[in-house]
A protein has these predicted regions:
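Feature marks extracellular polysaccharide-active and adherence modules
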Residues: 11, 16-18, 92
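Non-catalytic interaction/regulatory modules that flank or connect domains
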Residues: 16, 28-33
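Substrate-binding/catalytic cleft of secreted carbohydrate-active enzymes
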Residues: 1, 26-27, 42, 71
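Surface beta-loop-beta hairpin patches that serve as ligand-binding interfaces in beta-rich domains
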Residues: 32, 37-195
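Extracellular/lumenal ectodomain signal focusing on beta-strand-rich modules
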Residues: 7, 12, 87-88
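Right-handed parallel beta-helix/beta-solenoid
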Residues: 1-6, 79
Length: 195
């Protein structure tokens, strides 16, 4: 079986398009449509790079009436992309969502500033993101949400086989049943020292 990418899952992430450095834009313009297989000048942010990939249901329907490789009912399903899952992601500053994503929020009204700042005692996130995100609109991600990985045909779970439940943020703060997308539960958590 030949796999042409896919089997990717994106849940409750925040995508912020940073300004493209002029030299990177110049390189992309120079390459135009003459990119090579190693460098496509990918400086744009979001899951839109998966446009054209199937959802699981679309992918699974290819195998209905399966009668063996080469049969008319299966066509090229062995050489197509694997499915993609995406839901509840937030997109800012021109970042773009996958065309089939559910519950995506694309904010074209606000500009998000985000950077890492070094202080005497460590590294901190500097952002206005949590002034913009005020609503808890995503659910908790778990083994049940993630389903099974394609190749091992196994669920995403802890090493001991127990279910994964992402109910804590980066610092171990408990998330509510309805939570904010991203690594932190709220603005206060995002202001803590990272490292």
């Amino acid at each position: 079986m030949t796999i042409l990418h896919g089997d990717d899952r994106f849940y409750n992430n925040i995508f912020v398009q940073k300004p493209i450095r002029p030299c990177m834009q110049d390189l992309a313009d120079l390459m135009g449509n003459n990119g090579n297989m190693w460098d496509d000048c990918n400086v744009l942010t979001g899951t839109f790079k998966f446009n054209g990939y199937p959802t699981f249901d679309e992918w699974n329907r290819q195998f209905e009436g399966y009668c063996g490789m080469g049969s008319e009912t299966t066509g090229n399903c062995y050489y197509d992309h694997l499915p993609v899952w995406a839901s509840g992601n937030l997109y800012f500053n021109g970042a773009r969502a996958w065309e089939k994503e559910t519950d995506a929020v694309t904010d074209t009204e606000h500009t998000v500033d985000i950077s890492i700042e070094e202080k005497e005692d460590g590294w901190y996130l500097k952002t206005n993101l949590y002034d913009i995100i005020k609503e808890e609109n995503d659910g908790i991600i778990s083994t049940e949400t993630l389903g099974m990985a394609f190749e091992p045909e196994q669920k995403y779970e802890n090493p001991d086989g127990s279910p994964i439940i992402f109910n804590q943020d980066f610092f171990g703060n408990h998330r509510n049943v309805k939570t904010v997308a991203g690594p932190f539960t709220d603005k206060k958590a995002s202001e803590q020292k990272l490292f």
